[in-house]
Swiss-Prot record:
Domain of life: Eukaryota
Gene Ontology biological process terms from the UniProt entry: vesicle-mediated transport
GO cellular component: Golgi apparatus
Record-given protein name: Trafficking protein particle complex subunit 11
Protein family per UniProt: Belongs to the TRAPPC11 family.
InterPro entries, sorted: TPC11 (IPR021773), TRAPPC11_C (IPR025876)
Subunit structure of this chain's protein: Component of the multisubunit TRAPP (transport protein particle) complex, which includes at least TRAPPC2, TRAPPC2L, TRAPPC3, TRAPPC3L, TRAPPC4, TRAPPC5, TRAPPC8, TRAPPC9, TRAPPC10, TRAPPC11 and TRAPPC12.
Primary role: Involved in endoplasmic reticulum to Golgi apparatus trafficking at a very early stage.
Keyword Acetylation: yes
Keyword Lipoprotein appears in the UniProt entry: no
Residues with N6-acetyllysine modification: K245
Compartments reported by the entry: Golgi apparatus; Golgi apparatus, cis-Golgi network
Swiss-Prot/TrEMBL keywords: Acetylation, ER-Golgi transport, Golgi apparatus, Transport
Length: 1133
C-alpha cells in the first residue's frame, strides 16, 4: 500500500456544494459568454449561494445510471462505500444542467431558433437518461425585458418555447447582457439553487426508499452505505443539521458490523470518514465540546481494533491520521473564530498524532526487518486493474470478498509482505517531525513553554534518527537553556548525550568540547564510568587525537565521522577554543572575591579566585588569568604552569594548577592600584582558565565577571533557603556555598593625617561679609606639599542658593554677582610635620535660609607601597551648615501731622513717614547711617537728616525715625504712588575697621494719593491759658479750578467763649486762600475741646466735617491762670 493511503480523500475533506453544469457557453471565443462565466465563478463572496459551477459542452456524456433494483433479496454487497461515489456526486453528476441560448423575443427567425433550442435540450436529456437531474434554459438577450404582463409577444413566445422544450415556466430564464449583469447572475444563482435543492431532496427520498427492502442479516453494509449517502446528500442540500443526525446514525451502524481481521480495515476506514464528517459539522455548528466528545468516543471504540498483528504499524498510522485530522479541524475552527485555551488546543492532538507516528516507526522497524535477500513480490499484489480500489478500506488482492475465512492464505501472505516492504520505504521521521512541528507551533501560540520545549526535544531526536544532525543540534541547543534555568538535570543530561552524539558524528570540535565539559559537570546525572569515558575522549581531542565513538550510534554514520575526525586533525587551523560558560554548566566552578569592597590607594588590592572541579578524576590546567576593566592590571594576575598535553591527567599530586574533584582551590592575587584610579571602580570583567596546551589543542573556559554559570544563581538561592547544617571542614578549606562573588571594588584615596578646624560666629546676616576661618594642621610624619583649599557652597544644592552666595578671600571689599559660590584649588603652600596655618574665607549670602558649606583640603605626600615610592594625593573635607537671617526687621507707616494712621494721603497736604528698626541679630549691630531716598513724586517738607547715626542695637532693641513729606497732585494713579527707598548702612559692632559697611535697601510701600477741593490749615498757639485771649487763624485754600461757594459755621464749646463770625457764606477763587480770624477765650483748664469749625462746600457735598478734622486741631491744652508776678521773679524763673 502506498504511504498516502492514510490521507483522507479530497472529496471527503471539502465542503460539499450543489453541482450545476452550464452548457451552450463558448467561454473561449465569445466575449459575452466569457463575461457570463466570469460573473458566475470569479470573485465569489461568502454571502452567495454555495454552488459549484462547471462549463461543459451540450453533448457531454454524464456517468451512466445503473438500472434500479426492484429487490435486494439475493443481493450481497461487496463493500460499504465505493471510492468514486463522493467524487461522482460532487464533480460528475449535476443536480441541474443549464442550457444557455442566445435568443431575443423579437427574433425574426423565431421558429428555427425555437426548434434548435428544443433540440439542444433534448440532447442534454438523452445524456442524462435515467437520472433525476433538472434541466433549465437561460435565454441570453441583448435588450432589457419589459415588466411581466406588458410584453404580450414575450409571454406568448415564452409559453411556446416551454412547450417545445417540455419545460415548466420555472425552468425558463432570461439573462439580459447589460451593465447590471452581476445582479442578474445572482438572481439566476438563487433560482438554480432552488432547483438543486429539489434534486437532492429527491435523491434522499430515493435512497430512503431502498431501505425498505433491506434486512439486517445480509445487508448490514448497505445500512451504513445508505445512511452515509443520505447524510452526504443532506450536506449537498446544505441541510447540515439532518446531515449530522444521519452521520451519527451511520457511525453507530458501522460499529454494529461484525468485525474480523479481513474487514477490520474497511470498518476503521469508514468509521474514520464518518467521524471526520461529524466533527467537522460540530465545529461548523459552533459546538466544539460535542466535536471533542465524539472524537474521544471514536478513539475509545477504535484504538483496540488493531487487526492483523503482522500489520500493526497500519493501525498506528491510522490512529496518527485520526488525531492529525482532528487537529486540522480544530485549528481551522479557531481560524474561523473559535476560542481555544491552554489545556484544550490543537497542539495536544498533533502531539498524539506524532506519538502514534513514532509507534508506527517502531512497529515497522520490528515487523519489516526482512533480510536483504527478500524481494518485492511480482506481480505486485497491491496493483489493481483500474489503478484504484473499488471500495474504501479493502485489500487490493481480495476486493469484494466478505468471507471471514481466507480462501488463499498464500496470496494473503504475499500481500502482507508487499505492504511490509512498502512500509520500509516510508520516511517516518519526516512524518513525525511535521506533526511535532505543528504541535510546537500550537503550544507556542497558546503560551505553553514546557510543552513546546518537550516537543522540540523530540523533534531534535527525530532529526538525529533521520541523520540530519545539523538541525538536531540546533533544536536541542535551543531548548537546553530552558532545562538549565529550571534545573531539570536528568532531562538536560539526556539532551546533552544526544547533542554530544550529533557533534561527534559531524566532527564539530567546539560543540563536542562544550557538551563534554557539561556532561562531566555537576549538572550531569551520568554514572562515573560514563563520565570517565567522556573525560578520556575530551583529553584525546585536546591532544589532537580522534575521540572514541559515542555508544549506540549508527555504524555507517560512525565510519563517516571517523573520516571527518581524521580530516580535522590533519587540517591546520586555530587550536584555541574560547568557550563562554555563563550559558551552560561546566565541570569547573569559579568564584572571584575581593577582600574588601574598597581599598586605599596606598594598600595593595587583594582578591581570591576559588576553583572547584566536579569531574570524576583530578585534572591539571595550564593557565589562570584575570581580566579587569583597566587592562593594565591584567599582567599582575596570571598564574601559569607549563605542562604537556599528556600531563593533563598525570602527576596530579603535584603542581599548583591541579584541581582535585570536590575540593575547593584558592588562588590569591594582589596588585598596587594606580593613583589615577582613585575614585574609580576596579571590576573583574572575566576569568579565563586554560585546559590543554597550544601544542595540541587548548580550551579557554571564560567566566564573565567574577564567575558563575547557568546553574549558579539557582544554587545560591537554594543554599540561602536551606536550613541544613554544613559539615565542619579543616581550617584551610571553605564551604563552596558560603563563598559570595564580589567582582568589583573601589579605589579610595589614602587616609589623610591632617586636621581641619572651622571657626565662625553663626548665624550669618544677609549680605554681610561673613568670616569663616579655616585652620589646617599637619600630623603627617613627612612634609606635605601642594596643599590646596577648596571652600564655598557645597555643590548639589538649590540653584537659587548658588546664584545668591558669593565667596572671596578678601574681606575688605564687598562681593558682587561676579564672585563664585565656590573657590577651588586655592594654593596655601607646604606644611612641615606639626605645622599649622589659617586662612580666612568670606561668604556673602544674599538670601535667608540654611546653606551647607564645604571646606576641602588636598595635598600630596610621598609614601612607599610594597617597597615602591609613590606620590599619593590625600584630601580631607569638612562641611558646616550655616543659617542666614535678616539683621533687622523694618516697619514703615504713614501718619498725619496729628500722628493718626493714614490709609491714604492727600495732595499737597503734609504727612509723616515713620520707620522702626528692630534688631533680629544675636550679635550687636551698629547703625552707621540711614538715608531716605524719595521718589520723584515725593518732596520733603524740611531737611532730611538721619536720626539714628552711630546707634548700637542689641538683640531685640529698636530705633525709630520720622520724616515730614508732601505729595504733589499726580492725578489718579492705579496702585498708588511710589514713596522711595530707605537705605540703612550697618555692620557688626564686633567687626574690625577693615570690614566694609553693609547697605540694606528697604523699598518703601506705595501710597494712595487723593485730591481734596479745599484745604483748611489752623494757625494757633501750642497752648492756652484760662481767661487769656487765644487768637486762632483758619486758612482756607481752594485746590480746584472752580470758584468755591463755602458755608462756614462755628459750634460753641462749654470751655471757650469766642469772638468772630459764627456763620458766614463766602466765595473763594481758584488757587486763592481766604483767612478767618477768631479770638477764643478759655474758661477752664485742662485738655479742652475747641469750638468746632464746620464747612459745607456747595459744589462738593462729599466734603465732610470728619475729613476736615484730619487737618485742623480739635482740642488744645489750657493752662490754669497764674498769679501776678513781677518781672524779676519771671526772670528768676
Amino acid at each position: 500500500m502506498s504511504p498516502t493511503q492514510w490521507d483522507f480523500p479530497v472529496e471527503l475533506c471539502c465542503r460539499p456544494m450543489a453541482f450545476v453544469t452550464l452548457t451552450g457557453l463558448d467561454v473561449v471565443y465569445n466575449a459575452v459568454h466569457r463575461a457570463v462565466w466570469d460573473a458566475f465563478c470569479a470573485n465569489r463572496r461568502a454571502d452567495r449561494v454555495p454552488i459549484s459551477f462547471k462549463v461543459l459542452p451540450g453533448d457531454h456524456e454524464y456517468p451512466k445510471c445503473r438500472p434500479k433494483r426492484t429487490s435486494y433479496e439475493w443481493y450481497i454487497p461487496k463493500g460499504i462505500l465505493k471510492t468514486g461515489w463522493m467524487n461522482k456526486h460532487l464533480n460528475l453528476v449535476p443536480a441541474l444542467v443549464v442550457v444557455f441560448y442566445e435568443l431575443d423575443w423579437d427574433e425574426p427567425q423565431w421558429k428555427e431558433k425555437q426548434s434548435e433550442c428544443a433540440t439542444r435540450v433534448e440532447i442534454v436529456r438523452q445524456s442524462l437518461q435515467g437520472r433525476n437531474t433538472k434541466v433549465a434554459v437561460v435565454l441570453i438577450q441583448k435588450k432589457t425585458p419589459l415588466p411581466p404582463g406588458e410584453d404580450v409577444i414575450a409571454s406568448e413566445r415564452a409559453a411556446a418555447l416551454c412547450n417545445a422544450c417540455e419545460l415548466s415556466g420555472k425552468s425558463l430564464f432570461v439573462l439580459p447582457h447589460t451593465d447590471h449583469l452581476v445582479g442578474y447572475i445572482i438572481r439566476l444563482e438563487n433560482a438554480f439553487y432552488e432547483h438543486a435543492q429539489t434534486y437532492y431532496y429527491t435523491e434522499i427520498r430515493r435512497v430512503k426508499s431502498h431501505k425498505e427492502f433491506l434486512n439486517k442479516t445480509t445487508h448490514q453494509l448497505l445500512f451504513v452505505r445508505h445512511q452515509f449517502k443520505i447524510a452526504f446528500f443532506s450536506e449537498l442540500k446544505q441541510d447540515t443539521q439532518n446531515a449530522l443526525k444521519n452521520y451519527r446514525t451511520a457511525y453507530n451502524l458501522v460499529h454494529e458490523l461484525r468485525a474480523h481481521e479481513t474487514n477490520i480495515l474497511e470498518i476503521k476506514t469508514m468509521a474514520g470518514f464518518i467521524n471526520y464528517k461529524i466533527c467537522r459539522l460540530c465545529f461548523q455548528h459552533n459546538t466544539p465540546l460535542d466535536a471533542i466528545a465524539q472524537f474521544r468516543k471514536h478513539i475509545d471504540l477504535c484504538k483496540k481494533k488493531i487487526g492483523s498483528a503482522e500489520l500493526a504499524f497500519e493501525h498506528a498510522a491510522w490512529m496518527s491520521k485520526q488525531f492529525q485530522a482532528f487537529g486540522d479541524l480544530f485549528d481551522e475552527a479557531i481560524k474561523l473564530g473559535l476560542t481555544a485555551i491552554q489545556t484544550q488546543n490543537p497542539g495536544f492532538y498533533y502531539q498524539q498524532a506524532a506519538y502514534y507516528a513514532q509507534e508506527r516507526k517502531q512497529l515497522a522497524k520490528a515487523l519489516c526487518n526482512h533480510e536483504a535477500s527478500v524481494t518485492y513480490p511480482n506481480p505486485d499484489p497491491l496493483e489493481t486493474q483500474a489503478g484504484v480500489l473499488d471500495f474504501y478500506g479493502q485489500r487490493s488482492w481480495r476486493q469484494g470478498v466478505l468471507s471471514f475465512d481466507l480462501s488463499d492464505p498464500e496470496k494473503e501472505k504475499v500481500g502482507i509482505l508487499a505492504i511490509q516492504l512498502k512500509e520500509r520505504s516510508v520516511v517516518h521521521s519526516e512524518v513525525i517531525i511535521t506533526l511535532l512541528s505543528n504541535a510546537v507551533a500550537q503550544f507556542k501560540k497558546y503560551k505553553c513553554p514546557r510543552m513546546k520545549s518537550h516537543l522540540m526535544v523530540q523533534m531534535g531526536e527525530e532529526y538525529y534518527y533521520a541523520k540530519d544532525y545539523t538541525k538536531a543540534l540546533k533544536l536541542l541547543d535551543y531548548v537546553m537553556c530552558d532545562y538549565r534555568s529550571e534545573g531539570w538535570w536528568t532531562l538536560l543530561t539526556s539532551i546533552l548525550t544526544t547533542a554530544l552524539k550529533c557533534s561527534y558524528l559531524m566532527a564539530q570540535l567546539k560543540d563536542y568540547i562544550t557538551y563534554s565539559l557539561e556532561l562531566l559537570g555537576r549538572a550531569s546525572t551520568l554514572k562515573d564510568d560514563q563520565k570517565s569515558r567522556i573525560e578520556k575522549n575530551l583529553i584525546n581531542v585536546l591532544m589532537n587525537e580522534s575521540p572514541d565513538p559515542e555508544p549506540d550510534c549508527d555504524i555507517l554514520a560512525v565510519k563517516t565521522a571517523q573520516k571527518l575526525w581524521v580530516d580535522r586533525i590533519s587540517l591546520a587551523g586555530s587550536n584555541v577554543f574560547t568557550i563562554g560558560v555563563q550559558d551552560f554548566v561546566p565541570f569547573v566552578q569559579c568564584k572571584a572575591k575581593f577582600h574588601a569592597p574598597s581599598f586605599h590607594v596606598d594598600v595593595p588590592v587583594q582578591f581570591d579566585v576559588y576553583l572547584k572541579a566536579d569531574c570524576p578524576h583530578p585534572i591539571r590546567f595550564s593557565k589562570l588569568c584575570i581580566s579587569f576593566n583597566n587592562q593594565e592590571y591584567n599582567q599582575f594576575c596570571v598564574i601559569e604552569e607549563a605542562s604537556k598535553a599528556s600531563d593533563v591527567l598525570e602527576n596530579l599530586t603535584q603542581g599548583k594548577m591541579c584541581l582535585v574533584p570536590g575540593k575547593t582551590r584558592k588562588f590569591l592575587f594582589k596588585f598596587v592600584a594606580k593613583t589615577e584610579d582613585v575614585g574609580k571602580k576596579i571590576e573583574i570583567t572575566s576569568v579565563d582558565l586554560v585546559l590543554g596546551s597550544e601544542a595540541g589543542r587548548c580550551v579557554v573556559l571564560n567566566w564573565q565577571g567574577g564567575g558563575g554559570d547557568a546553574a549558579s544563581a539557582q544554587e545560591a538561592l537554594q543554599a540561602s533557603r536551606s536550613f541544613k547544617r554544613r559539615p565542619r571542614l579543616p581550617d584551610s578549606e571553605v564551604h563552596w556555598d558560603g563563598i559570595v562573588i564580589q567582582a568589583s571594588t573601589m579605589i579610595i584615596s589614602r587616609v589623610p593625617n591632617i586636621s581641619v578646624h572651622l571657626r565662625h560666629d553663626p548665624p550669618a546676616l544677609t549680605n554681610e561679609m561673613y568670616c569663616l576661618v579655616v585652620t589646617v594642621q599637619s600630623h603627617e610624619k613627612s612634609p606635605i606639599r601642594d596643599v590646596k583649599l577648596t571652600a564655598g557652597l557645597k555643590p548639589g544644592q538649590d540653584a537659587n542658593l548658588t546664584q545668591k552666595t558669593h565667596v572671596t578671600l578678601h574681606g575688605t571689599e564687598l562681593c558682587d554677582e561676579s564672585y563664585p559660590a565656590l573657590l577651588t584649588d586655592i594654593p596655601i603652600g607646604d606644611l612641615q610635620p606639626g605645622e599649622q596655618l589659617e586662612k580666612a574665607v568670606y561668604v556673602r549670602c544674599g538670601t535667608v535660609g540654611s546653606r551647607m558649606f564645604l571646606v576641602y583640603v588636598s595635598y600630596l605626600i610621598n609614601t612607599a607601597i610594597e617597597g615602591k615610592e609613590t606620590v599619593c594625593k590625600c584630601h580631607k573635607d569638612e562641611t558646616v551648615t550655616i543659617e542666614t537671617v535678616f539683621p533687622f526687621d523694618v516697619a514703615v507707616k504713614f501718619v498725619s501731622t496729628k500722628f493718626e494712621h493714614l490709609e491714604r494721603v492727600y495732595a499737597d497736604i503734609p504727612f509723616l513717614l515713620m520707620t522702626d528698626l528692630l534688631s533680629a541679630s544675636p550679635w550687636a549691630l551698629t547703625i552707621v547711617s540711614s538715608e531716605l531716598q524719595l521718589a520723584p513724586s515725593m518732596t520733603p517738607v524740611d531737611q532730611l537728616e538721619s536720626q539714628v547715626d552711630r546707634v548700637v542695637l542689641q538683640t531685640g532693641e529698636s530705633a525709630s525715625e520720622c520724616f515730614c513729606l508732601r505729595c504733589p497732585s499726580v492725578g489718579n494713579v492705579e496702585g498708588g504712588v511710589a514713596t522711595g527707598h530707605y537705605v540703612i548702612s550697618w555692620k557688626r559692632t564686633s567687626a574690625t575697621d577693615g570690614v566694609p559697611v553693609i547697605s540694606t535697601v528697604i523699598t518703601l510701600p506705595h501710597v494712595i494719593v487723593e485730591n481734596i477741593p479745599l484745604h483748611v490749615n489752623a494757625d494757633l498757639p501750642s497752648f492756652g491759658r484760662v481767661r487769656e485771649s487765644l487768637p486762632v487763624r483758619y486758612h482756607l485754600q481752594n485746590k480746584t479750578d472752580l470758584v468755591q461757594d463755602v458755608e462756614i459755621s462755628v459750634e460753641p464749646s462749654d470751655a471757650f467763649m469766642f469772638s468772630g463770625l459764627k456763620q458766614i457764606r463766602l466765595r473763594i477763587l481758584p488757587g486763592t486762600e481766604q483767612e478767618m480770624l477768631y479770638n477764643f477765650y478759655p474758661l477752664m483748664a485742662g485738655y479742652q475741646q475747641l469750638p468746632s469749625l464746620n464747612i459745607n462746600l456747595l459744589r462738593f457735598p462729599n466734603f465732610t466735617n470728619q475729613l476736615l478734622r484730619r487737618f485742623i486741631p480739635t482740642s488744645i491744652f489750657v493752662k490754669p491762670q497764674g498769679r501776678l508776678v513781677d518781672d524779676a521773679s519771671i526772670a528768676a524763673a
